[in-house]
Each structure stands twice: as structure tokens, then as C-alpha cells.
Swiss-Prot record:
CDD domains: Syd. Gene3D superfamilies: Syd protein. GO terms for cellular component: cytoplasmic side of plasma membrane. This is Protein Syd. The keyword Membrane applies. The lineage of its organism: Bacteria, Pseudomonadati, Pseudomonadota, Gammaproteobacteria, Enterobacterales. It is found in: Cell inner membrane.
Length: 181
């Protein structure tokens, strides 16, 4: 496990939860995750849940992605998806506002790996360098991803070669993220 990335993700999650506590006096809330089972759920309300991050309970790898694609995934990506269970978190990096994707439960972890595989299959078909997404943007054509060749965090326009480097590593990227509520 990439400890630097795991620590950076844990620190950002703490900043996010602290900001939520300051603004609302509660743990983070979600309407989108209402009715979706997770070890993160503290309380279920009328149309939303309160959640807090929980330790990841499965093997801490995305080996299914590696096996399916016959590649070695950057250690930082393993750490990103297997450090914790948590809800997706809104964040800002420089001028980009995004939804930082997280694994909500054991079932969600399987779905995330399937989506990563689908993303990599499309890239392979288009002869693009492999990336693994970590966040979504308002534009459905752009994502924040980790380049699997060098570990850089990039803003990528899906299906194209358009990629802008945002940070030299996932840990650096996470350490610069600001919570958005």
C-alpha cells in the first residue's frame, strides 16, 4: 500500500468531515446514498443518511483490474480505492470543482473495479495511454484521473488525447484539495 496516498486521503476526508461539522453540526449527509447499504451509515433520516468514513474491510488491492487488463496498477490507485469506505466528497483543486469518488461498500468496490476495467478497455481500443479515474467533473466529458504510466494526476477529456497535468502524484493532489460543501 502507498502510505503517503493513504495518509493524504485520510487527511482530506478529515478536512471534509470537519468542514461539514463546522457548517452543519453533523457528519456529512447524502440524499443520493439513501437506501444504499454501507458500513458508513450512522443514521437514516426521512430522505437522507448521515455517514462517516470506515476502515476498508477487503484485501487492499484492485487486483481484479490488474488481472482483467494484464497491467500493474499504480500503487497510489490501490491505496486510493482501498484505504476507506466513504461517501463521494465534493472538492476543489485550483479552479476545478469535482466529486472525489470513493468506495461506499464491499458491493460498490466490485462495481468501481468493473467501471475502471471498462474505462481501460475503451482507452485500449482507442490506443490511449491507460488512466484510472478518481473524480468526476460537471462536464461529463472530463474526469480527473491518475496516469498509470507515470502516476501523475491529470484532467482528461474522455476518448481523446487531451490531458492536462494537475499534480505529480496522487498524494500531492489530495494534499492540495479543499473541501466544498
Amino acid at each position: 500500500m502507498d502510505i503517503e496516498t493513504a495518509n493524504a486521503l485520510t487527511a482530506f476526508t478529515a478536512r471534509y468531515c470537519d468542514a461539514w461539522h463546522e457548517m452543519n453540526g453533523t457528519w456529512p449527509q447524502s440524499e443520493e446514498l439513501y437506501g444504499v447499504p454501507s458500513p458508513c451509515i450512522i443514521t437514516t433520516m426521512d430522505d437522507k443518511i448521515l455517514w462517516q468514513p470506515q476502515p476498508f474491510s477487503l484485501e487492499q488491492t484492485v487486483n481484479a483490474v490488474e488481472r482483467a487488463m494484464d497491467i500493474v496498477v499504480q500503487p497510489a490507485v490501490h491505496a486510493f480505492y482501498t484505504t476507506q469506505f466513504a461517501g463521494d466528497m465534493q472538492a476543489r483543486f485550483a479552479n476545478e470543482t469535482m466529486t472525489l469518488l470513493q468506495t461506499w461498500s464491499e458491493n460498490d468496490f466490485q462495481r468501481v473495479q468493473e467501471n475502471l476495467i471498462g474505462h481501460l478497455v475503451t482507452q485500449k481500443r482507442l490506443k490511449l495511454a491507460p488512466t484510472l479515474f478518481i473524480a468526476t467533473l460537471d462536464s461529463e466529458l472530463d474526469v480527473i484521473a491518475v496516469c498509470n504510466l507515470n502516476g501523475e494526476v491529470i484532467k482528461e477529456t474522455l476518448g481523446t488525447r487531451k490531458r492536462d497535468v494537475l499534480a505529480p502524484s496522487l498524494a500531492d493532489f489530495l494534499n492540495q484539495l479543499e473541501p466544498v460543501l
